[in-house]
């Protein structure tokens, strides 16, 4: 079996594109191997800060053969009355370099069917590699040189080989060779003898091409540091992945910052060191003043360590100054400064947003029937939940928004429950009741406000993260088991920005509810569709979905779904639920009516307790009565009064079922 290599050398790639490039390379390599009929091959991709590519292993000598078919003239045109080939058939064969041996008859036409031999693999690999390189998509491609080419970064070299032979490949005006390049400033050109020795060759030039090997190398150095120092480093996966993305030969740097900065809140220290210098803080029982960073290149000289220390000390000195200044300003005064900070141009200032959050939170407290004393805590938290955005520390370190609000609130002696909620309401899954209420109110205000001014997300663009905010609302409601009307909250929030609840906004939330059920709760597509109309009261929709998911596979319920479909289909164009039992002529009508009243009472009581499983058990009691009804009662009679009366009665049954779910979506499953 043969092995091939493709390496594309570029200027430094943005770390934000690392995972996208990696995923695309993996998917495209697999797709192209199949498309080029090299199905036995396997792909091992690699991405570094200045290169990416793939090693293809287990390649055959040639592509797989395939059978080619081409449609020709109809049989009555291809042969004369004596069954001999006509000029039309002869011309078709001549044009396709084929003979009568290649002809098959099918569906009244001539078809050419012949085996096409696969080409030698070295002949097709250049096209495969070209398709791979040019088929990658990037968020912000750029042009370089004469502007003729567009790519993620300017390309400087290409290595393309199969075994020890260089492939004939040209991309971006560059011809492939066996020459790669090592770490900038530490190594020059590197001759690659063959794909099998690619990784080994580059290591001599201080490049670890494999991202998996780089990650392993980083973790090994952290392990070694911990053993040597007796300290611990938190394995921050996000930071480790970023280091792997921006380095080609990561080497550990250990330094220390001034101990006086340990007086700062831990969150400030970690943020200044991690987010702004891509470094880890070492722990013993508590935070230490030792940090661990990673330099790209061979063992760093002493001045590199001093450089890290100088920059980190400077960042922490700035943070200390901002923190001390902030302590001079109470949160209440910071909140007043929000009047000078625009939330969004057409939605006013952040102060205006806080006022809306307070009103939505108060309305939510009313819906939840919370005690007045607790509501006051919620409103107190709401009034200062964005105050720290006006602080100097958050201006310098935006990722500490909410965190600093909690810290400043505790420093002022504000109730811990309220202080915690300031940070908690930003969480995707708030851990406190106050944080959950503020989290819903904040997100509803943002979503409604953006829809009001025309910032509506699409399938490909959601710059304000409205989809994630909607998902978080459903998540919070489910976690707290709050039976609230989301529709009423949206209507109320809309009135605060001079907006009316639109069909567009309702469609958005219905769509997000469906995605939430399927993607987060693992609800099947058909069940999610069956309860999607219940998004207006999300907890009920969720509980109904979970109950339907559980029982929908049971045989006794399949018949129920079919019975409901008969009722639903015949009443779907009838809106009224009015009927008069005195007009019933058949005994089956009266029996179904009496059973309906009995079942309805039990179903409604079960739904009051939010027990959807019990409600479904009651609904199944209607099944034999519905079957008997349709076997003996003709609904669509000519007499208007009888027909309308029967439809009105059946509409009552339809609406009772719809309180649990639209089971027509589940009938399809039962018929598979």
UniProtKB/Swiss-Prot annotation:
Its main location: cytoplasm. It is an enzyme of class 6 (ligase). Pfam families: DALR_1, tRNA_synt_2f. GO terms for molecular function: arginine-tRNA ligase activity; ATP binding; glycine-tRNA ligase activity. SUPFAM superfamilies: Anticodon-binding domain of a subclass of class I aminoacyl-tRNA synthetases (SSF47323), HD-domain/PDEase-like (SSF109604). GO terms for cellular component: cytosol. GO terms for biological process: arginyl-tRNA aminoacylation; glycyl-tRNA aminoacylation. This is Glycine--tRNA ligase beta subunit. It comes from Thermotoga petrophila (strain ATCC BAA-488 / DSM 13995 / JCM 10881 / RKU-1). The lineage of its organism: Bacteria, Thermotogati, Thermotogota, Thermotogae, Thermotogales. The gene is glyS.
């Amino acid at each position: 079996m043969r092995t091939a290599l493709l390496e594309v050398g570029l200027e430094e790639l943005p770390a934000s594109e690392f995972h996208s490039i990696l995923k695309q390379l993996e998917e495209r390599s697999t797709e192209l191997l199949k498309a080029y009929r090299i199905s036995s091959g396997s792909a091992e991709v690699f991405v570094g800060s200045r290169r990416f590519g793939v090693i293809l292993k287990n390649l055959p000598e040639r592509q797989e053969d395939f059978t080619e078919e081409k449609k020709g003239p109809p049989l009555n045109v291809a042969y004369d009355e004596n069954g001999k080939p006509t000029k039309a058939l002869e011309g078709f064969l001549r044009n396709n370099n084929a003979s009568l041996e290649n002809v098959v008859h099918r569906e009244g036409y001539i078809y050419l069917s012949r085996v096409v031999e696969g080409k030698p693999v070295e002949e097709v690999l250049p096209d495969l590699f070209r398709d791979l390189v040019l088929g990658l998509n990037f968020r912000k491609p750029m042009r370089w040189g004469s502007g003729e080419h567009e790519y993620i970064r300017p390309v400087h070299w290409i290595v393309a080989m199969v075994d020890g032979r260089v492939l004939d490949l040209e991309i971006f005006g560059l011809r492939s060779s066996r020459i790669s390049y090592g770490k900038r400033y530490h190594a020059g050109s590197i001759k690659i003898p063959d794909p099998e020795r690619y990784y080994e060759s580059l290591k001599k030039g201080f490049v670890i091409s494999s991202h998996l090997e780089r990650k392993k190398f980083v973790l090994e150095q952290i392990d070694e540091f911990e053993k040597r120092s007796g300290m611990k480093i938190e394995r921050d996966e996000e930071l480790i992945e970023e280091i792997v993305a921006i380095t080609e030969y990561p080497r550990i740097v250990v330094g220390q910052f001034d101990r006086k900065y340990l007086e700062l809140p831990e969150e400030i220290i970690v943020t200044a060191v991690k987010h702004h210098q891509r470094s880890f803080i070492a722990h013993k029982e508590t935070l230490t003043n030792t940090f661990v960073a990673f330099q790209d290149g061979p063992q760093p000289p002493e001045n590199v360590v001093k450089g890290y220390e100088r920059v980190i000390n400077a960042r922490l000195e700035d943070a200390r100054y901002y923190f001390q200044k902030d302590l001079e300003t109470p949160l209440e005064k910071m909140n007043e400064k929000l009047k000078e900070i625009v939330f969004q141009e057409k939605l006013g200032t952040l102060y205006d947003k806080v006022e809306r959050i307070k009103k939505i939170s108060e309305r939510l407290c009313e819906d939840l029937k919370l005690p007045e004393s607790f509501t006051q805590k919620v409103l107190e938290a709401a009034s200062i939940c964005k105050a720290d955005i006006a602080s100097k520390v958050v201006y310098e370190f935006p990722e500490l928004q909410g965190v600093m609000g909690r810290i400043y609130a505790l420093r002022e002696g504000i109730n811990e429950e309220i202080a915690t909620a300031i940070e908690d309401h930003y969480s995707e899954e708030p851990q406190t009741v106050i944080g959950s209420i503020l989290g819903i109110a904040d997100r509803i205000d943002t979503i409604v406000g953006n829809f009001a001014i025309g910032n509506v997300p699409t399938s490909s663009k959601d710059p304000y993260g409205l989809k994630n905010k909607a998902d978080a609302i459903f998540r919070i409601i489910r976690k707290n088991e709050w039976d609230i009307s989301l529709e009423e909250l949206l209507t109320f929030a809309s009135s605060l920005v001079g907006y009316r609840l639109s069909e567009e906004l309702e469609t958005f939330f219905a769509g997000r509810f469906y995605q939430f059920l399927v993607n987060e709760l693992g609800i099947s597509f058909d069940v999610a569709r069956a309860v999607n109309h219940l998004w207006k009261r999300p907890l009920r929709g969720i509980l109904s979905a979970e109950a339907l998911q559980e029982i929908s596979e049971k045989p006794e319920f399949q018949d129920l779904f079919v019975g409901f479909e008969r009722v639903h289909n015949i009443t779907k164009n009838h809106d009224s639920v009015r009927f008069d039992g005195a007009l019933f002529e058949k005994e089956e009508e009266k029996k179904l009516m009496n059973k309906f009243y009995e079942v309805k009472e039990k179903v409604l009581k079960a739904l009051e307790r939010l027990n959807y499983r019990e409600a479904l058990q009651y609904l199944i009691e209607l099944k034999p009565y519905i079957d008997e009804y349709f076997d003996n009662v003709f609904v669509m009679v000519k007499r208007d009064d009888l027909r309308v009366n029967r439809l009105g009665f059946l509409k009552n049954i339809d609406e009772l079922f719809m309180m649990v779910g639209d089971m027509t979506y589940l009938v399809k499953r039962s018929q598979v």
